[in-house]
Swiss-Prot record:
GO molecular function list: ATP binding; histidine-tRNA ligase activity
Listed SUPFAM superfamilies: Class II aaRS ABD-related (SSF52954), Class II aaRS and biotin synthetases (SSF55681)
UniProt-listed GO biological process terms: histidyl-tRNA aminoacylation
This protein's record includes keyword Nucleotide-binding: yes
Main location, first listed in the record: cytoplasm
Reactions this protein catalyses: tRNA(His) + L-histidine + ATP = L-histidyl-tRNA(His) + AMP + diphosphate + H(+)
Pfam families: HGTP_anticodon, tRNA-synt_His
The protein's name in its UniProt record: Histidine--tRNA ligase
Length: 429
């Protein structure tokens, strides 16, 4: 065993597991294309103030969970990204993309970092996939990102998910509610935990997001934001619900749902999985019209988005048995050299097959035919192509189907044609 171990809160992903990641990623890519979203990639680190301005200084993420550092004593603080939305919006504003096209639909699959206590489904380095729809203020926009997210989960075959939605209104609604909430919480001030006391003045809505069991009785008794909403905000929320109903997307309304980021407005949503225990959120998102202005834009930019935790998706799928038939794909052909002296010819044949788009493996260690065949079976190769002295002279090679045991001798050109036909039949089945 190596004296060096993986850093706590990070993990290695080996080939037998990476096939599961690719499966989920392929579904995300395919559906993103169907919905008209293009991929964006941003740096893994940003200036720290980007997240302080966007996520909010009273959030747990900014207050406790960011990996920040100074690249040099006179430099600005830099942070490994704890979430994607702020970086995506920064990139769009910096590139001035909204001046060239008023609507942008972007998606990502990215690595993120938070200083959390490692546990199942919650690591210090973790992955998310998500989407951002920028430039559309219609309730149809947030309904689309919810639909996109739920269709990913449906396509993956995940069962038993619960979608909760709420409306946070606009800035005036929340300002009005903050005063009502402070008035309610004031008599309980001495019972608030330290984090909630810090939030009491700055942003009491964050108190509603507390997971402290000792705080739940106080939170349950709090007035809801719903009672402070304007007619326009309620009407906006009703339209979102209409779009979800028309698509038969089931949901529950949860007036306590505020999400963990300060930039949300109007509709917010969260999806939970019964397979994940206490940390049951598998995805979520909402609308964030004011984020662009917080980051220096001259005005608001209507925007909606979602993010889902890749590790939590994989845990849920594993527990529901959705990977039972999923295995790493082996090579289509294993080229077997009957003696080490024929390795050069075997490599030439393998090169020819690969040039034709046929996945091919060849033994480089000069092992016996028996060892090579064991290797071919271990790799789940579909065919073995044998290279012997007679084959080199005649140009006719023995090709064995390792599933049916059928064997034929053909020229390399005919073998390539047969293998390509086999590939087409495989894809059509």
């Amino acid at each position: 065993m190596s004296q060096y171990q993986v850093v706590k809160g990070a993990r290695d992903i080996f080939p037998d597991e990476i096939v599961r990641w690719h499966y989920v990623e392929d579904v995300v890519h395919r559906l993103a294309s169907l919905y008209g979203y293009s991929e964006i990639r941003t740096p893994v680190f940003e200036y720290t103030e980007l997240f302080q301005r966007s996520i909010g200084t009273t959030t747990d993420i900014v207050g406790k969970e960011m990996f920040s550092f100074l690249p040099d004593p006179q430099g600005r603080s830099i942070t490994l990204r704890p979430e994607m939305t702020a970086g995506v919006m920064r990139a769009v504003l910096q590139k001035n993309l909204l001046s060239t096209a008023p609507i942008h639909k972007l998606f990502y699959l990215s690595e993120l970092f938070r200083k959390e206590r490692p546990q199942a489904g919650r690591q210090r380095q973790f992955s998310q996939f998500g989407a951002e729809l920028l430039g559309v203020s219609s309730p149809a926009a947030v309904a689309e990102v919810i639909t996109f997210m739920m269709q990913v989960f449906e396509t993956l075959g995940i069962r038993g998910l619960k979608l909760r939605i709420n409306t946070l209104g606009d800035s005036s609604d929340r300002a009005r509610y903050r005063e009502i909430l402070r008035a309610y919480l004031a008599p309980f001030y001495d019972r608030l935990d330290l984090a909630s006391r810090e939030r009491f003045e700055k942003n009491p809505l964050r108190i509603l997001d507390s997971k402290n069991p000792d705080m739940q009785e106080i939170i349950e008794g709090a007035p809801t934001l719903h009672d402070s909403l304007s007619h326009e905000a309620l009407e906006d929320f009703e339209k979102v619900r209409f779009y979800l109903d028309s698509r038969s997307i089931a949901y529950d309304i949860d007036y306590r749902l505020v999400r963990g980021l300060d930039y949300y407005c109007h509709t917010a949503f969260e999806v939970t999985s019964p397979e994940l225990g206490a940390q049951d959120a598998i995805g979520g998102g909402g609308r964030y019209d004011g984020l662009a202005k917080e980051l220096g834009s001259s005005g608001d930019v209507p925007a909606s988005g979602f993010a889902a935790g890749m590790e939590r998706v994989l845990i849920t799928m594993e527990k529901q048995g959705l990977f039972a038939a999923l295995r790493p794909s082996g090579p289509k052909v294993y080229v077997v050299a009957q003696q080490h002296a024929l390795l050069d010819h075997a490599l030439q044949v393998a090169y020819r097959l690969r040039r034709e788009g046929i996945s091919t493996e060849v033994d480089l260690a000069g092992r016996s035919m028996k060892a090579q065949m064991r290797d071919a079976n271990r790799m789940r190769a579909c065919f073995a192509l044998f290279i012997g002295e007679d084959e080199v002279v005649s140009g006719s090679y023995a090709l064995k189907n390792l599933v049916t045991a059928d064997q034929t001798a053909q020229s390399i050109e005919t073998i390539i044609e047969m293998l390509n036909q086999y590939s087409g039949a495989e894809q059509g089945s």
